[in-house]
A protein has these predicted regions:
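Structural motif
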Residues: 35-49
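Hydrophobic beta-strand segments
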Residues: 52-56, 85, 123, 161, ...
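A short, solvent-exposed loop/turn motif at the edges and junctions
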Residues: 56-60, 84-97
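Short, acidic Ser/Thr/Gly-rich low-complexity loop/linker segments typical of extracellular
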Residues: 59-72
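Structured extracytoplasmic
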Residues: 82, 116, 126-299, 305-313, ...
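Conserved "repeat-terminator" motif of extracellular CCP/Sushi domains
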Residues: 107-117, 121-125
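Exposed, low-structure sequence patches enriched in small/polar residues
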Residues: 270-272, 401-854
Length: 854
C-alpha cells in the first residue's frame, strides 16, 4: 500500500520543480521587500557596535536577533511586532524604539556608554569584511588556545578543592495581579518572593531550590580522572513521588558543568564548541575591544560570536591577561536570539578566575536561563562557588577511602549547613524552603503535580498504589482484537522494601484472560519506587500473556497503544507461561550484574505451528529453562529514571553489555544450548555537525535449538520510528544462530538547514540512519530431514517461508528525515535495500516519532 502511494507521488514530482521555483521566488521577494534594517552605533565614537541584542515581542512571545560584526541588524515585518524593539548591550544604556521609528532599510540607532564596574570597553569594530589572516584578535586567541594546558588546573599533578552549588527553578513572566487568579489563588503567598530576571526584567517566582556541597580530588599518579565526593545535599522536595535523583540529573544536564577551557561545552543536552576550542578559530569571529584593569591585572577585552548565528555557538566577551600567560580572567557567554535551541529565550553564563598560589583558578560560575514552552515560562539559575584549593598529593591520597557520598549526606541539619556553606543563603533563597513546606499542604497544588506525573511517568498516584501504565490500558492486534488492560503497582507508602506489581488483560477477539504478578524486594533504601538508581533488587514473577517472539521492546511492551498501529497484521504470536526469579545489582559507578532463572512454556497462536519436521513431535507447549547472566558497564552514564524505564541523557561514554544464557534440560525443557551476545553503544559529537549514535552487536548460539530460540532480529511493523529496530523488517522475518549488527543514527542538529535563509527560521534539523545485520543459521539449526526434531520455519498460505536466514547478504535499510517539526515531531522516510522479494515486503515508507529536545 505504501509503495503504491509513493509511486503516485513520484509521478507527480515531475510537475513540482517549476512550481517550487516560482513559489520560492515570491517568498524570497516578499522577504526582501519586508525587511527593515539598520545599524547600531556608539554615540561617542560613532563606530558600529557588533553583538547588540535586538529583541521584541510577537503575540506576547519574545523574539529577536543580534547585530553582526559591522553593527547591522535585520528585522522582519514590523506588523508582526507587538509594540517596541529593545536594543541592549553590556556597558550601554538600553534603547527602546517604537516599531514606527524603525520603518526603513537604513535606520541608525545610537547607544550611549554608561559607567560599568569592570571599566567596560569601547567597541572598535571595523566595517571591512572579517578576516582571520593578519587579525590581531585571532592571533591573541591562538596564544590563549596554545596556553590552555598551562593555565588549566588539569595541568597539576595533584589537587583538591571544595565546591558549593546552588540551583533554582522559577515560574516566570508573572505579575502581581495573578496572585488572586487561578491557578495561583490558593498559593498566592509565593508571590511574596517575586524577583526580577537579570536577563530581561521579567518577574519570576521561585518554586524549586537545591544545594550541594562536594569535594573534588585528583592525583595523576593513581587516576586519570578527578573524583568528586558529595558531603551534603538538600533540596525542595516538590513531592515525595518525584524522583529527585533524575530531577537533579536532568537539571544538571540543562545547566551543565561548564569549563571554558574544554574543547566542547555541554549545555541544554547539547554540546557547543567552546570559544577556546582548537576549532574555535574556524567557528567563531573574534574582535579586540579595548584594555582595562580587573582585580590587579591588565586585561584585553575580546568579543566573539559564531560565524553563523544559527549554529550551536555563543556570542560574548572575555578578559585575557596582557602577559605571557594569556589566561582568561573572566568570560561571559550568551546564546544569540536567533539560536536553534528549543524552548530557550535567553541564556547567560559567567565564569571568573582568581590568582591563588601563583595560579589562576576558577572561583565562580554563574548561569541564568529563561525558558519558554507554549503556555509556560520559566527561569533557571545555577551558581557554583569554589574554595579551599590544595595542591598536595598526601591529602588527595586520604580521599581514596571515602565513598562517593558520605553517610547521611542528604540528612544534614541547619547547623551543619550554616558552618560549611562557602556562600550563605540570601533571604530570597531561604524563603524558597519556607514556601515549599507550605505548598506541600495545598490540595490543588498536589493534584496538579500528580497530573503532571501521570502524563510524564504513565502512572496515576492513588496513595499506596499507582495505577498504570496508562498507555497500555487499550490496544489491539490481529490475534486478540481489542485488548483491555488494568495494571498497577505499590510504592513506598505500602512498604519501604517490599513492592508488588501486576496486571490483568482481556482480548475481545480471543476471549482470553492474561495476567502478571510480580513481587520485588529492594535491599537498598528508596525514596518512592523500587527502580530508583542504584538497583539492589530481588524479584519473583509469574505471567501468562501473549507475546511477539524475539521482540525485545526498548521501552514498554507490545501492548503499548502506539504499537497497535501496524502496516501488516501482527499474527505471529505465542501464548507464554513464564516463571522468573531475578536479581539485579548495580554500583554507583554504573556497573551492573543481572542474574536470572526462568521457566518458559510457549503455545503457538494463529498461523504458528510447533510440529517437528518429521511430524512425530508437537511442541505444544515448547518448553525452555534458562540460567542467564548479564554484565553491563556504562561509565558516567546519565539518565532520567521513570517508574520503570530509563531514558539516557546525552551520554557520550560507551556502554558495554555482555549476556550469557544457558538453556538447560534440568527441569524438563526440550533443548539444551548456550547463547552469547555482546553489544557496544556510543555517541559521538562531531563539532558543530551534530552527533552520531552507533551500536554494534554480535551473537552466537552453541547447540541445537528451534527457530523460536534463535536470535530473531528486532523488527518494527508499526508506523512509529524506532532507533533500535529495523523499521521495514517484518516480525519473525529473519533468524540467525550467529550474526553481527550495526546501527548508526546521525543528527545534523540543523547544520544544513541553518544555512538556508528561509528554512533556518523553522529550526528544522536533519537526521539520517543506516542499519545492517548479517548472519546465518548453521546446518545444525536448519530445519530439514537431517534435523527431524526441529520446527519448520513459518510459511504463508501459498507455502512461501515467512522466516528466512541472512546467508545471501546483509539486511540493509537507510533513512533520511526532518526532526524538530513544531519542536516535537520527527518524520523519516525509510528505504529497504535488500531482500525485497520476501513475502509482504514494504520497500519504503514514512515513519514518525515524537521527539522533544532542546
Amino acid at each position: 500500500m505504501e509503495s503504491t502511494t509513493h509511486i503516485t507521488i513520484q509521478d507527480k514530482r515531475r510537475k513540482l520543480p517549476s512550481f517550487l521555483v516560482i513559489a520560492l521566488f515570491f517568498l524570497c521577494s516578499a522577504a526582501c521587500l519586508a525587511q527593515n534594517a539598520g545599524c547600531v552605533i556608539d554615540g561617542k565614537t560613532k563606530e558600529p557596535m557588533p553583538f547588540v541584542n535586538v529583541s521584541y515581542h510577537t503575540k506576547g512571545r519574545l523574539n529577536g536577533t543580534t547585530t553582526d560584526a559591522n553593527g547591522n541588524y535585520v528585522l522582519g515585518l514590523l506588523s508582526q511586532i507587538d509594540d517596541s524593539v529593545v536594543f541592549q548591550c553590556v556597558g550601554y544604556t538600553t534603547v527602546t524604539k517604537h516599531k514606527s521609528e524603525l520603518n526603513g532599510s537604513d535606520i541608525i540607532v545610537t547607544m550611549q556608554q554608561k559607567s560599568f564596574e569592570l571599566n567596560e570597553f569601547t567597541v572598535k569594530a571595523r566595517r571591512e569584511h572579517y578576516r582571520r589572516k593578519n587579525n590581531p584578535a585571532v592571533e591573541l586567541m591562538r596564544k590563549v588556545i596554545a596556553n590552555k594546558q598551562r593555565n588549566s588546573i588539569e595541568n597539576a599533578d595533584a589537587y583538591s578543592y571544595r565546591k558549593h552549588e546552588k540551583m533554582e527553578v522559577s515560574l516566570s513572566n508573572l505579575n502581581e495581579s495573578m496572585r488572586y487568579k487561578a491557578p495561583f489563588k490558593k498559593i498566592g503567598f509565593i508571590f511574596d518572593n517575586m524577583q526580577e530576571s537579570e536577563l530581561n526584567g521579567k518577574k519570576y517566582v521561585p518554586l524549586y531550590f537545591m544545594e550541594n556541597l562536594s569535594e573534588t580530588y585528583f592525583d595523576r599518579s593513581s587516576s586519570s580522572t578527578p573524583r568528586t565526593i558529595t558531603t551534603a545535599n538538600r533540596d525542595v522536595e516538590v513531592d515525595k513521588f518525584l524522583d529527585q535523583y533524575s530531577l537533579e540529573l536532568a537539571m544538571d544536564e540543562v545547566f551543565g558543568d561548564i569549563d571554558i577551557y574544554d574543547e566542547r561545552i555541554p549545555l541544554l543536552s547539547n554540546e557547543f564548541i567552546s570559544p577556546l576550542s582548537q576549532y574555535g578559530i574556524l567557528f567563531y569571529h573574534y574582535h579586540i575591544a579595548d584594555t582595562f584593569y580587573f582585580d590587579g591585572d591588565t586585561c584585553i577585552s575580546l568579543l566573539f560570536s559564531p560565524a553563523n548565528q544559527q549554529d550551536f555557538g555563543f556570542y560574548g566577551k572575555m578578559a585575557v591577561t596582557k602577559d605571557s600567560l594569556c589566561a582568561v580572567r573572566k568570560v561571559q557567554l550568551n546564546l544569540p536570539y536567533s539560536n536553534s535551541v528549543n524552548f530557550v529565550e535567553q541564556i547567560r553564563f559567567e565564569q571568573e578566575y582568581q590568582r591563588r598560589d601563583g595560579r589562576l583558578l576558577v572561583a565562580l560560575k554563574n548561569i541564568v536561563v529563561d525558558f519558554h514552552v507554549p503556555g509556560v515560562s520559566a527561569h533557571g539559575r545555577k551558581r557554583t562557588i569554589y574554595d579551599d584549593y590544595v595542591f598536595d598529593s598526601i591529602i588527595v591520597a586520604k580521599s581514596r577511602k571515602l565513598p562517593d557520598h558520605v553517610p547521611n549526606y542528604n540528612k544534614r541539619d541547619d547547623d551543619y549547613w550554616n558552618e560549611h556553606r562557602i556562600e550563605p543563603l540570601t533571604p530570597n533563597e531561604q524563603r524558597i524552603y519556607d514556601d515549599a513546606a507550605r505548598l506541600s499542604g495545598v490540595t490543588p497544588y498536589r493534584v496538579l503535580v500528580k497530573t503532571i506525573m501521570a502524563v510524564a511517568g504513565g502512572y496515576v498516584d492513588l496513595g499506596k498504589v499507582d495505577w498504570g501504565p496508562v498507555e497500555n490500558t487499550v490496544s489491539w492486534n490481529s490475534v486478540e482484537g481489542v485488548r483491555l488492560r488494568l495494571g498497577g503497582k505499590t510504592n513506598m507508602n505500602f512498604n519501604e522494601h517490599l513492592f508488588f506489581s501486576g496486571f490483568v488483560a482481556y482480548g475481545l477477539k480471543d476471549y482470553r484472560f492474561k495476567y502478571n504478578i510480580k513481587a520485588m524486594y529492594s535491599f537498598a533504601e528508596k525514596k518512592y519506587h523500587q527502580y530508583e538508581f542504584p538497583h539492589n533488587l530481588l524479584s519473583l514473577a509469574y505471567e501468562e500473556n501473549t507475546t511477539i517472539p524475539g521482540q525485545e521492546f526498548m521501552m514498554g511492551t507490545s501492548d503499548r497503544l502506539f504499537q497497535s498501529f501496524s502496516h501488516t497484521g501482527i499474527d505471529k504470536m505465542t501464548f507464554d507461561r513464564k516463571l522468573t526469579l531475578q536479581y539485579d545489582y548495580e554500583t554507583p559507578r554504573h556497573f551492573s550484574i543481572k542474574t536470572k532463572v526462568e521457566h518458559l512454556e510457549q503455545e503457538p497462536l494463529a498461523d504458528l505451528d510447533f510440529t517437528s519436521v518429521d511430524g512425530k513431535t508437537e511442541y505444544n507447549p515448547l518448553r525452555s529453562d534458562i540460567f542467564e547472566l548479564q554484565l553491563r558497564f556504562a561509565p558516567r552514564e546519565r539518565f532520567y529514571q521513570s517508574y520503570e524505564y530509563r531514558m539516557p541523557i546525552n551520554n557520550t561514554s560507551p556502554v558495554y553489555t555482555l549476556t550469557y544464557t544457558y538453556g538447560t534440560r534440568l527441569f524438563g525443557a526440550d533443548f539444551e544450548y548456550h547463547k552469547l551476545k555482546a553489544r557496544l553503544q556510543k555517541r559521538w559529537f562531531v563539532l558543530s555537525l551534530g552527533f552520531l549514535d552507533v551500536s554494534v552487536e554480535a551473537g552466537k548460539i552453541f547447540g541445537q535449538v528451534p527457530h523460536l530460540l534463535l536470535f530473531v532480529h528486532h523488527a518494527n511493523q508499526g508506523y512509529t520510528y524506532q532507533d533500535e529496530a529495523f523499521n521495514l523488517m517484518n516480525y519473525f522475518e529473519f533468524a540467525s544462530d550467529q550474526y553481527v549488527q550495526l546501527m548508526a543514527n546521525y543528527s545534523f542538529n540543523g547544520f544544513i538547514f541553518n544555512r538556508i535563509p528561509l528554512l533556518k527560521k523553522l529550526k528544522w534539523r536533519e537526521v539520517c540512519s543506516a542499519k545492517a545485520v548479517w548472519g546465518d543459521v548453521s546446518s545444525l539449526n536448519m530445519p530439514s530431514a537431517d534435523n527431524p526434531k526441529l520446527i519448520p520455519f513459518p510459511t504463508n498460505a501459498d507455502g512461501e517461508p515467512e522466516t528466512s536466514t541472512l546467508a545471501k547478504m546483509p539486511y540493509v535499510e537507510v533513512s533520511a528525515g526532518i526532526d524538530n517539526i513544531f519542536k516535537l515531531l520527527c518524520l523519516e522516510y525509510v528505504w529497504r535495500l535488500t531482500y525485497l522479494d520476501n513475502p509482504n515486503t514494504i520497500p519504503h515508507g514514512l515513519r514518525f516519532r515524537v521527539h522533544i529536545a532542546f
